[in-house]
């Protein structure tokens, strides 16, 4: 399995209401992108100086699934919302070994 993690910081003008709407669109992506096995989305709860404001954790069977997600039109639509309000984005993609 491949795990995709993305953490964001946003401009202050990106309101909590707008963030909640954006997160609801992200949470709907597994219904539109079959390669997306699971997705967790949530705001930071600590507010530490080094914290990002929001995180996404998404799981895929393989790298092909991750590639399908990144180029899927539904994913592109969600990115259109975050692009103008994003201050920073950091991502990491890593393999989770089989439990067997």
Language-model-detected regions and their locations in the chain:
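Short S/T/G/P-rich N-terminal loop/turn motif that feeds into the first structured element of a domain
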Residues: 1-53, 61-71, 94-100
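Short, flexible helix/strand-to-coil boundary loops that buttress conserved ligand/catalytic motifs
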Residues: 70, 79-82
């Amino acid at each position: 399995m491949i795990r995709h993690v993305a953490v964001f910081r946003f401009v202050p003008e990106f309101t909590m209401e707008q963030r909640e709407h954006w997160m609801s669109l992200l949470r709907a992506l597994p219904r539109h992108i079959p390669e997306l096995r699971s997705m967790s989305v949530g705001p930071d709860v600590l507010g530490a100086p080094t914290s990002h404001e929001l995180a996404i954790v998404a799981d895929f069977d393989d790298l092909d699934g991750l590639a399908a997600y990144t180029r899927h039109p539904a994913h592109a639509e969600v990115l259109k919302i975050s692009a103008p309000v994003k201050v920073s984005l950091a991502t990491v993609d890593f393999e989770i070994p089989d439990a067997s």
